Amino acid sequence: MSEAFDSRASKALPIEVLISPFVRFARMEAASGILLIVSTAAALVWANSPWKSSYDAIWDVPMVAGVGNFLLTESRHHWINDGLMSIFFFLVGLEIKREVLIGELTSLRNAAFPLIAAVGGTVVPAVIYLLCVGGGVAQKGWGIPMATDIAFALGVLILLGNRIPPSLRVFVTALAIVDDIIAVLVIALFYTHEIHLVSLLVALGGVGIAFGFNLLGISKPSVYALIGVCIWAAVLKSGVHATVAGVLLAFTIPARNYLDRDFFVKRGRWLLERFEKSEPHSFESHTAIHTLQHQCDMIESPLHRLEHGLQPWVSFLIMPLFAFSNAGVRFIGNIGVAVKHPVSIGVALGLFLGKPLGIWLFAWLAVKSRVANAPPELSWWQIFGASWICGIGFTMSLFIASLAFGYGNLLDMSKIGTLAASLVAGVCGSVVLWRRSALGTSEPPVSPATTSASV
C-alpha cells in the first residue's frame, strides 16, 4: 500500500517537471544573494554600455496610482524606493517583532551582546565617514556606511556551510536585526524633510486602529493590508519617509495564534479520518479539506503567516528589482574621481574598516567589562570575520544614499564606495572565516564562563 502511495505521489505534472530547476534554485538558502549579484551586475553592465541613457530613462517614466480624487504620480524609481521598499521594511518589522517576542532579543541577557556590537557597527562607520568628508553637503551621507545588507551577509555565511558554528549565524542575524532597528530610526529621524503634522497624526491614528484590530482578535491579512495602504499614504504625505510606515504596520500584526494546540491535533485527526472515509470529490471530502485548511490558518499566527508568505516576494522580486534600478552607476570617467573623492572614500572606509572595527571593539569591551556574554563556542577570530562580512552594506547602503543625496555626483560617488567596500568586505570576511576553520579550533573561546551562566 505504501509503495503504491509513493508511486502515485512521485508522478509529476509536465509543468512541475518544467519548472523544477527553478524551484530547486529558489529553495537554495543562498539563492536570493545570487539573484542580487546578478541584478547588480546587469545594472552595472547596462549603465556602462552605449545604452546608458535608456537605463536612466526607463526608471524616470511616471506612473499613476490611486482611487478617485486621491492620485499619486511618481516615477518608476520612486515607486520602487517608496512603495516596494515599504513592503521590504514591513518584513523587517515582522522579523524585529518576532525576535523581540520569541527570538534572540527576547531577554536583555541574550540581546546585550549583539545589541552592543551593532551599536559599535553603526557609530564607528559614521564617525569615520564624517572625518573623511569634513563639512558641507556631503555630511548628509553619514548614515550610508552604518547599514548591513542582511540577505547578503547571511548568504555569505550560508555559502561557508559547516565551516562556521551555527551560533555565529545566530549572532549575525541578531546583530543585523538590531542594525535594521537603528537604520529605521536613522531614516525616520534624520532623513525626514518638512513634517506635515496633520498627515502624521492621520498615520498614527491608522496605526492605533490597527492595534485595536489586533486587540479585537482580527487576524485577516486583507484588513491590515487595507489600513496599511492608508498609513503608507499618510506617512508619504507627512514628510517622513514612506518606508517607516511598513515598520509601524508590522508592529501591529498579531503574533499569537487563535487555536489551542491540543484542540488542533484532535480536530485535525478527526478531519483526516472523515476525509479518508468519504467518497472522492464528495461534498463531505471537500468540507473536511476546507475545514482543515481553516484550522491550519488559525494555529499559525498572522505574523508568521505573513512573514512566510512575503519572504519569497521580497527576496526574489523586490530586492533584485531595487538593486537593478539603483545599482547602475557609470564607472567610465568616475573611477579616477572616486578614488580621491571624500564621499566614496568615507563610505568605503566606513564599511570596510569601520564596520568590523566597531563591531569587534564594542563586542570585546562588552565581554571584558562583563556587561554581556558571548556564545561560548565562538572565538574572537570568528567574530572578527563575521564583523567584516557585516561590512556588506549593499542594498541598505544604496537605499540610504538615495535618501541622503537624491541624484547627482555625490550619489554616484557613494554608490561606487558602497559597491567596492561591500565586495572587499565580503571577500575578506569569508577568507578569515575559511582560514580559521582550516587551521582548526584550538583558539580560546570568547566567553569561557558563559556555559555555566547560560539559562
UniProtKB/Swiss-Prot annotation:
Transmembrane in keyword set: yes
Organism encoding this protein: Koribacter versatilis (strain Ellin345)
GO molecular function terms listed in the Swiss-Prot or TrEMBL record: sodium:proton antiporter activity
GO cellular-component term (any): plasma membrane
Name of the featured protein: Na(+)/H(+) antiporter NhaA
Keywords attached to this entry: Antiport, Cell inner membrane, Cell membrane, Ion transport, Membrane, Sodium, Sodium transport, Transmembrane, Transmembrane helix, Transport
Single GO BP term: regulation of pH
UniProt-listed NCBIfam families: NhaA
Subcellular location: Cell inner membrane
Topology with respect to the bilayer: Multi-pass membrane protein
Keyword Ubl conjugation: no
